[in-house]
Amino acid sequence: MPRETAPREVTLLADARARARRARDWATADDLKAQIEAAGWNVVDTGTLYDLHRAVPPDVEVDGVLHYGGAASVPSRLGDPPVGTVSVVLVATDDAAAIARSHAAVIANAPSVSQVVIVANAPAEDVATVIADIEASAPETPPTEVVRTARRLGHGEALNAGLRRCAAPVVLLLDPSVEVRGDLAAACAAALADPSVAVAGPVGLVSEDLRTFEPADDAAGECDVDVIDGAAFAFRREDVEARGPLDDHFVIPAHLDTWWSLVLRDPWAIEEPVEGAPVRRAVRLASVPAVRHAGLESPVRGNQEKLEKKAFYRVLKRFATRQDLLVANRP
């Protein structure tokens, strides 16, 4: 859902705290942070700037089943040793047929998958029924785990909730609109076995200016691209800890794939970057059988065009000048 705007009194506290931090008055900054948190908000620093987030709502137990108030409440497996080969994450919201079809296709056609995580993102009633049926009938191998939320999360946060439960070394984010008809997971894992590759998937996009992105030429076969389309998007689980989490300002799917592709490829996106490290690659896979039945489903209502613009500005805020990340500008 669209991010809630903090009350003016909380924003004033945050502004005062930012000034204190710039002045290195840490005691005052800590006191102001405590006041912000007491008002029910969290402040997240980004350099000399900040973001305000409503504190995560409480988890809710319904009929003995825990529904998480936010992604941060979901117990994380990201620090555990990897298990299996590929974890698939599906986010279910309002399309019952899509989640049933996509999950069934993964189980039937992708033997490389070792775990499926379904995020039941405060779904519609018929979707909740389908998910319950999946839980009851899903095979033990690969296991299917359902993460339920107490409220409708934005797209980025919903994916974060699923990512926190992933156990395998490779993660495949799969939109329910996609029906795999072959072992897409195996193809993604094979591509990511190359340490120079950061992200892989069946649809790739390229750009000459970081403002407009176009599908890569189909005739090119498997090739390097700038961005992998978010409908089917694979990367290493270890990068979630090193470079994540996903930015939950992306409340709809639009442009989150662009942002995360560039974060994964950017040699400066880690805590201790190595001088001279190369830009990592995004690889568009060729001849991977999958059918996309519709566009990505938005988890939120509201003015989609306005939300898309805000999401794109989020990309530009970080990467507008990073021409070095574009395949077209390789030496």
List each model region and its residues.
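Short, acidic, metal-binding catalytic loop of nucleotide-sugar glycosyltransferases
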Residues: A104-V113
